[in-house]
């Protein structure tokens, strides 16, 4: 977890947005902070990303309740470093509140999100492969492409490749279980796509 320490080991005011992995780590921290505050979880060992975040940034516990201050700090970082607005985090709040009623629900929820995000990134990368060569400064065009791709994943039923259709069905099931909207999914994928475009390409890539 050295990358998380590198991300959180600077003064917050001087932080710069990291890569895709750093963004996904902050998403997990936010999930765990919401779960801690909503479910009254006090054992930080059960929330590894939140534990590192809290210790490295020295976030004090608010009102003797784990998760409140950490959630606020993480939301601020997602907004300032990655441009994720309040609607993005509010949808996470609503999803977790509705689907995690007890501590035992946490593991299943995180497993579902892991499957959702992995399938989503793999499929969008496949469907947008050539479009992703568009330079990063064409942000509006890339967002429109992402929006169309996510719309197809949510609504199109005539994919020719059976493997693609199988993954589409799995993503729709995950989205329904997690309660994430098409708009939330579009914004999530767009941010990951833009961060991925900034990362060094491997030698075998065109």
Task: Write out the residue ranges for each language-model feature.
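Small-residue-enriched hydrophobic alpha-helices in membranes
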Residues: 2-60, 67-206
């Amino acid at each position: 977890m050295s990358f998380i320490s590198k991300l959180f080991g600077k003064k917050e005011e001087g932080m710069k947005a990291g890569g895709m992995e750093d963004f996904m780590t902050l998403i997990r921290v936010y999930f765990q902070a919401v779960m801690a505050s909503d479910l009254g979880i006090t054992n930080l060992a059960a929330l590894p990303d939140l534990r590192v975040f809290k210790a490295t940034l020295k976030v004090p516990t608010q009102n003797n309740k784990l998760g409140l201050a950490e959630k606020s700090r993480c939301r601020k970082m997602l907004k300032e470093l990655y441009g994720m607005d309040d609607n993005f985090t509010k949808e996470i709040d609503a999803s977790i509140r509705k689907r995690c009623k007890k501590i035992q629900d946490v593991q299943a929820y995180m497993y579902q999100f892991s499957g959702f995000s992995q399938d989503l990134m793999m499929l969008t990368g496949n469907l947008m492969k050539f479009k992703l060569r568009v330079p990063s400064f064409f942000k509006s065009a890339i967002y429109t492409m992402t929006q169309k791709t996510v719309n197809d994943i949510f609504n199109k039923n005539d994919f020719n490749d059976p493997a693609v259709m199988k993954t589409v069905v799995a993503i729709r099931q995950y989205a329904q279980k997690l309660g994430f909207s098409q708009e939330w999914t579009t914004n999530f994928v767009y941010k990951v796509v833009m961060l991925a475009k900034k990362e060094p390409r491997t030698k075998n890539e065109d």
